[in-house]
Regions:
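NAD(P)-dependent Rossmann-like dehydrogenase/reductase catalytic/cofactor-binding core
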Residues: 51-122
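Internal alpha-helical scaffold of NAD(P)-dependent oxidoreductase catalytic cores
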Residues: 1-18, 28-69, 113, 117
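Alpha-helical membrane segments and immediately flanking helix-loop junctions
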Residues: 21-22
């Protein structure tokens, strides 16, 4: 597929989670991009420039991860200096599992919707 790889599932019931997580994945990522773009535009950065900056940021990050074969947590450690700006933002994200909780809840809702749609087709 254009967005991913082919993966055979061991159990048919796993399809709902994979549909929710990976089927919607490009939209979730673009939603995050859109949030970043909105922030940049509020800082008077033009739309075209903001899109280029965001795409370059994500492409560079992905390319680095692939080239260095580095785990996400290790790249975070390399970027987030102790007491620095990135660490401050990451602490806010992780307070009460804030960011993780939003993502997990959203994917769970999508998974439940996939199950509902499957039942309606039976």
């Amino acid at each position: 597929s254009f967005f991913g790889i082919l993966l055979w599932l061991k159990k048919e019931e796993e399809i709902d989670f994979f549909t929710a997580f990976f089927g919607g994945g490009p939209a979730y990522i673009c939603y995050f991009f859109q949030c970043l773009q909105n922030m940049l535009e509020k800082k008077n950065i033009k739309k075209k420039v903001s899109i280029e900056l965001i795409v370059t940021l994500f492409n560079g990050t992905i390319n680095f991860i692939e080239k260095e074969k580095i785990e996400f947590k290790d790249l975070i450690k390399r970027v987030a200096s102790k007491g620095g700006t990135t660490e401050k933002a990451l602490k806010y994200f992780s307070q009460n599992n804030r960011f993780d909780s939003v993502i997990t809840t959203a994917i769970n809702k999508a998974e439940n919707r996939s199950k509902e749609l499957s039942k309606n087709q039976s």
